[in-house]
Amino acid sequence: MALNIEEIIASVKEASVLELNDLVKAIEEEFGVTAAAPVAVAAAGGAAAEQTEFTVELASAGDSKIKVIKVVREITGLGLKEAKELVDNAPKALKEGVAKEEAEEIKAKLEEVGANVEVK
């Protein structure tokens, strides 16, 4: 049986949407394939982009809560009440979008007075 491509294309052009849908389903079943568009897989980059902005998060105040509140006030510029609320409601973000060096300095200051700090 010789295939005439032009006749097949002409038949497809004349078919209704329902007939074409049935044709696709029949082809999928007959050949075990799917008509779904392939999903593009993101190419893995050589190295992950280096993070440039960090968030300093107070995990807990530790044993010396008053000292931690003082350092939080110094770092954030918050008033006493706001700094106390922040420390009481830990874990909370202290500073967001800071450079790595500044984040490490803040972490060191807080850990020096007994706080548990995470840099994300």
UniProtKB/Swiss-Prot annotation:
GO terms for cellular component: cytosolic large ribosomal subunit. It holds the Pfam family Ribosomal_L12_N. The keyword Ribosomal protein applies. GO terms for molecular function: mRNA binding; structural constituent of ribosome. Keywords: Ribonucleoprotein, Ribosomal protein. InterPro entries: Ribosomal_bL12, Ribosomal_bL12_C, Ribosomal_bL12_C/ClpS-like, Ribosomal_bL12_oligo, Ribosomal_bL12_oligo_N_sf. GO terms for biological process: translation. CDD domains: Ribosomal_L7_L12 (cd00387). It comes from the Bacteria. Disulfide bonds: none annotated. The keyword ATP-binding does not apply. Belongs to the bacterial ribosomal protein bL12 family. NCBIfam families: L12. Homodimer. Part of the ribosomal stalk of the 50S ribosomal subunit. Forms a multimeric L10(L12)X complex, where L10 forms an elongated spine to which 2 to 4 L12 dimers bind in a sequential fashion. Binds GTP-bound translation factors. Forms part of the ribosomal stalk which helps the ribosome interact with GTP-bound translation factors. Is thus essential for accurate translation. This is Large ribosomal subunit protein bL12. The lineage of its organism: Bacteria, Bacillati, Bacillota, Bacilli, Bacillales.
